[in-house]
Amino acid sequence: DRAVAAGATYIVSPGINPEVVKHCQRVGIPVIPGCSTASEIEIALSLGLKTVKFFPAEAVGGLKTIKALSAPYVDVNFVPTGGINEVNLLEYLNFSKIVACGGSWMVDQKAIDAKDWDAIETLTSSAVNRMLGFELKHIGINSGTPEQAMKDALSLAKILGWPVKDGNSSTFTGTALEFMKKPFRGAHGHIALGTNYIQRARWYLEQKGFAFDDESSYYKDGKLMAIYFKDEIAGFAFHLLQK
């Protein structure tokens, strides 16, 4: 109750206490209790929960144990904490049953004691950037016609020594330069920003005020692979691209 009064929007606990879970459910706040065994997961399921904290993650077998527990409990998702850091963060997040990770490296105790919120912001931002892994994947240039696209691609190939690959709608020089065969998005062209997790990247950027064009969404095997921002930047259309 004190946590909610202080502004908490969800509760995470190191272990599972049915009374605490039931109280959170009564007051309407999401709760993620700690579970590291099959018996504890059974308790969580009996309380109607399908997302649990996995703690202490590294000490009880880490990702190997989570995968073993996921085999019989196919509907359960995990939030591992305990021993998670920037080195192993992506290894955990790459497993589909893990919805989030927690780690104390993001909230250094010395910074907390000193109320150095800027330092904590820097640490947490670094963790988010590590997770999302943004990088420039390719630049699309509106050549306008198939002939011009090929001409432009060959010209850049002479400069860079990269191979040319002709496709249905565009011609690539290497993998970084795409020449469009007909007018496409963006006054000047488009830029693809690769990310490790496109759904997480979208949510993160929406919190920063960016909007996306859902009609531009491209799915493969039921998974979102690409989506454009609604607004251009410097005359370029930008889109996220799942790595």
Predicted regions and their residues:
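Catalytic cores of alpha/beta
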Residues: 1-6, 39-47, 71, 84-100
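Surface-exposed amphipathic alpha-helices with a cationic face
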Residues: 4, 21-26, 45, 66-71, ...
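C-terminal helical cap(s) of enzyme catalytic domains, especially alpha/beta-barrels
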Residues: 24-28, 110-132
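Vicinal oxygen chelate
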Residues: 121, 171, 175-182, 206-243
